[in-house]
Curated annotation (Swiss-Prot):
Keywords noted in UniProt: Endoplasmic reticulum, Heme, Iron, Membrane, Metal-binding, Microsome, Monooxygenase, Oxidoreductase
Cofactor(s) the protein requires to work: heme
Species name: Drosophila melanogaster
Gene that this sequence comes from: Cyp28d2
Enzyme class: oxidoreductase
SUPFAM superfamilies: Cytochrome P450
Record-given protein name: Probable cytochrome P450 28d2
Membrane topology: Peripheral membrane protein
Length: 501
């Protein structure tokens, strides 16, 4: 055999072996009697992972629309990892709540190594079993209604500064308006650092501290982590000897240093104690011997969980109120002109409804993935039962459920009234039916939900009292979400104009 022929045979053999490696388990769900969505080598069921031409959420939407009327679930693959896309709201509520023990863990734990990623690896979202229970039990009391109420005056003070910052920025703005995400990040950075650590990030000045700059960088996922995620989906055993942190070392060192300095200051100057998150952690250390590392980790969890998602939601609420001036006027009338107490802030049903409706249209988490932790069974519409075993992955199509006309009339339209309790039970009724998952559900629901909602409402109250929000023409008019960002945000950015009232 000539050298050229030998080379071609070797190449062909290699290609065949690679193809077999990538596709050998594509019958994983068919063998169990479950339909499988169209699947391709390398990309699995979600080609947008590689093409980057649209957000992966739209791949999930297409599969959901194709199978939702005939099946309760359908098999899908992320590269070559089998997952069960569950479309039945009753089953979804079981996964989150009633049968939680069988779906206890989030799939993210498969990609995070605690040894190499101290920040995310110790986050309750990633932790499992007793570690998750212990960490959550440390954090939840610090976010109780009484403690959120205790820092509410701090939030009000930050909001008034925020209004003045918006006013100054608007005076200097070009015809393209103000970047709503930049504004929102300035606000959440300031309010989280003040309520959590008792320090100002100087976000509303011309010389902000490095904290604001670092926070704007922190969720820019590195190419190395994306590559690692793809490789581990192709060959899961690689996790045993190769791991890449979601947050880089510079980020970790920066935040740990800030928190250590804040702890030292509190211990050296007890007269500066405040009833905030860090103070609660120090009290827990004194009462129960909480290790200093746990204080650092818990405080980092509070900070990092508190700014990016809340900023995204605030930016999109302002967008939706700008697009719907009649709803903006309703909220403005509801809040009135007098300062609101914490309890009064909790009783603004139309503002709540606007927040919930925005989260329905732009839920930051477009899909959720859970690991099966105990054997479980689901019945399909054809009567066939699928037996799930520990380690299997179930995917919940959050965005698709939120946009399904079967559950939400005219789903692409901003209709806050659907979440008013006077119209059928409010947000909780949708959540209990398994079709509203903006905050998750069950024991692993978002621990910072109460704090985040308070900060959102406090900001919106002050903004709407002082400004009329208008959407700048630079902002697109549809709800197309960004192609690559892993949380749902409007493609092209949100640009707003603020007119003094």
């Amino acid at each position: 055999m000539c050298p050229v022929t030998t080379f071609l045979v070797l190449v062909l053999t290699l290609l065949v072996l690679v193809y077999v490696f990538l596709t050998w388990n594509f019958n994983y769900w068919r063998k169990r009697g479950i339909k499988t969505a169209p699947t391709w080598p390398f990309v699995g069921s979600f080609p947008s992972i590689f093409t980057r031409k649209r957000n992966i959420a739209y791949d999930i939407d297409d599969i959901y629309e194709k199978y939702k009327d005939t099946d309760n679930m359908v098999g899908v693959f992320t590269t070559r990892v089998p997952q069960l896309l569950v479309m039945c709201p009753e089953y979804i509520h079981k996964i989150y709540a009633t049968d939680f023990r069988s779906f206890h863990n989030n799939e993210w734990r498969n990609f995070v190594n605690k040894k190499t990623d101290m920040i995310l690896g110790n986050n309750p979202f990633v932790l499992t079993g007793d570690e998750w229970k212990e960490r959550r039990s440390e954090i939840m009391p610090a976010l109780s209604p009484n403690r959120v109420k205790a820092v509410y005056p701090v939030s009000q003070s930050v909001c008034k500064k925020f209004v003045e910052y918006i006013r100054r920025q608007q005076q200097m703005a070009t015809s393209e308006g103000l970047d709503a995400m930049d504004l929102s990040l300035c606000y959440t950075t300031e309010v989280v650092s003040d309520c959590g650590l008792g320090v100002s990030a100087q976000s509303f000045t011309d010389t902000p501290t490095p904290l604001l700059k670092m926070i704007k960088r922190v969720f820019n996922t590195s190419f190395e982590f994306i590559f690692y995620s793809v490789v581990t989906n192709l060959w899961q055993k690689v996790r045993k000897f190769y791991s890449v942190p979601f947050f880089n070392k510079e980020t970790e060192v920066f935040f740990l240093d800030i928190i250590r300095r804040c702890i030292t200051l509190r211990l050296e100057k007890p007269e500066q104690q405040r009833d905030d998150f860090l103070n609660y952690m120090l009290q827990l250390q004194e009462k129960k011997g909480l290790h200093t590392d746990n204080i650092l980790i818990n405080t980092m969890t509070f900070i990092l969980d508190g700014f990016e998602t809340t900023a995204l939601v605030l930016a999109h609420i302002m967008l939706m109120l700008g697009r719907n001036p009649e709803e903006q006027d309703k909220v403005r009338k509801e809040i009135g002109s007098a300062d609101l107490t914490f309890d009064q802030m909790s009783e603004l049903p139309h503002l709540d409804a606007c927040i919930y409706e925005t989260l329905r249209l732009f839920s930051p988490q477009v899909a959720a993935r859970k690991l099966v932790t105990e054997p479980f069974e689901f019945a399909n519409k054809n009567g066939r039962t699928v037996h799930l075993k520990p380690g299997d992955v179930v995917t919940i199509p959050v965005k698709a459920l939120h946009h399904d006309p079967q559950y939400y009339e005219d789903p692409l339209t901003f209709k806050p009234e659907r979440f008013l309790e006077s119209n059928g039970g409010g947000m909780k009724s949708y959540r209990d039916r398994g079709v509203y998952l903006a905050f998750g559900d069950g024991p692993r629901h978002c621990p910072g939900m109460r704090f985040a909602l308070t900060q959102l409402k406090a900001a919106l109250v002050e903004i709407l009292r002082n400004f009329e929000i208008k959407v700048n023409p630079k902002t697109r008019s549809d709800n197309q979400i960004d192609d690559t960002f892993f949380m749902a945000t409007l493609k092209g950015g949100i640009y707003l104009d603020f007119k003094d009232l």
